[in-house]
Structures are given as C-alpha cells and as structure tokens.
C-alpha cells in the first residue's frame, strides 16, 4: 500500500514527496463532473448493460438466524497453481482479475440455474494517473454482468471489456446504479492478488494481524489473494444466513469452475458438484 511504502521510505531516510493531487481535489473535480456530459454518458452506459439484466442474484441462504453475525472461511487452492492462472491469462490476453470475476459469475449463475449472473466487485478507483500516489478512500463498488451462455472465450472477453468501460464511467455512483437497476452487494468477489503482501516495516519483520469482524460486507464476499505462491480464498459471510459447510461447498465449486476454465472447458461443460448430483 501507499502508506506502507512511504513509511519504509521514511525509515530509509528518503525525502517524501507532497501529494500533488489530493482526494479533496478529486472531490472537487467529481462535483464539476456531475453537471457535465460525462455523467449523462456514464448513466447511459450503465443503462445499456444493466437495464434488462434483471437485477443482482445471490447464493440462497440455508438458515435464518436471530441476529446478523460475521464469519470467515479460509481456503488455499489445491486444484491449480498461480503459474497455471498467470499462463492462461497471458495466453488469452486477460487479467487475473477478469479470470476470477468470470469464474465467480459462472459459479453464481449455475447456483441459480441460469446462464448469466449480476453481482458486484470493487476496484481501486485510481483510473487517473494523478491518483497513483494519492491517499484516500478511492475504492468503488462496480456491478458486473457475466453472460456465459456462449463460449468461455466470449465470456472472459466480454467481462474484461465491461470492466474497462465501467471503470471509465465510474463517475456514476453505485448508490444510483443500485436504485435504478436493483443491484445489491449481496454477492461480491474481490481479486487482491499480491498487492497487500508485505513482511517488513522499516527493515524489521512485520506480520499482518487479522481483525475480528463485527459485520460482514455482504451476505457472501470472496476475496482472492496470493500468499506463499498459492491462491487463497477468504470468504466472509453472514453466519446467520449460511452454515460453514455451505461456504466450504461454495469454495469447492468455485475451484471447480476455475479449474474448468483453465482446462479450456466451455461453461456448459463445467459441472459443479450439485449438477453432478442432479445428473445422476
């Protein structure tokens, strides 16, 4: 992260640069943009993608607790390696972010016995080079429409182009998107990669300490990161809505989908565990 890098630079005796473009400057520019053609164009873009998409879907709850609770399930992937995914993405001209968002979308859609899915992701919000070293809450929620009725290649390419377009039109707020197109952050996927990996501060060994959750970001939110050269699924979920076994089963199915994509299977040929049961 930016702050950790600056702390390490300070410990090393480097001179720190003053922010040239601050989050306050961004807020002023965004205010002006609300009255510009950019805002209307962004609204029209989101309408073209989501107006007839039917709203977001989720993973059906299997219980109803008395009060909301936040739980976490941790899984290191074993079906495929970081190298497998990187090689696949390079071959097909997509990012690892697109790979996992698409795998999540296919999994979610199949859970709902559909060939498409609407859900959410987040991105860093730094779509302007002036923001590369700006400290602030720039992260934004983006809706995703994943259509996997055709080939895997078509699905991956469409998701990649859509994410690029959505980032370019991020002046249109998610609160408005949610209201206009009935899209809620009930099912969310976040690809972190190794962006937040660190093992020292100021030249001394440092270890990240997990913070106990008191509220879940969403009923189901999957964060995918790279740790010790393995992909890790951190699934944050509402313990009052889902049993841990249900979430473990979801992790199994997400791994199955990702592995199927790597094997060049078409979406219709990727069989999740419950589809095998149904088929039998």
Kindly give the residue locations of the regions a language model identified.
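Acyl-group handoff/entry surfaces in thioester-processing enzymes
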Residues: 1-33, 54-60, 87, 91, ...
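Extended, hydrophobic beta-loop-alpha segments that form or line the acyl/peptidyl-thioester binding
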Residues: 1-8, 115-122, 149-155, 173-174, ...
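Short amphipathic alpha-helical face segments that pack within enzyme cores
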Residues: 2, 6, 95-107, 141, ...
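Phosphate/oxyanion-binding loops and surfaces in catalytic or ligand/nucleic-acid-binding neighborhoods
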Residues: 6-14, 48-56, 144-145, 162-169, ...
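Short amphipathic alpha-helices and their capping loops
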Residues: 9-10, 22-73, 279-280
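His-Asp-centered acyl/peptidyl-transfer active-site segments
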Residues: 33-43, 70-71, 89-97, 101, ...
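DNA breakage-rejoining catalytic core of tyrosine-based enzymes
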Residues: 70-82
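N-lobe entry segment of adenylate-forming
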Residues: 192, 255, 273-280
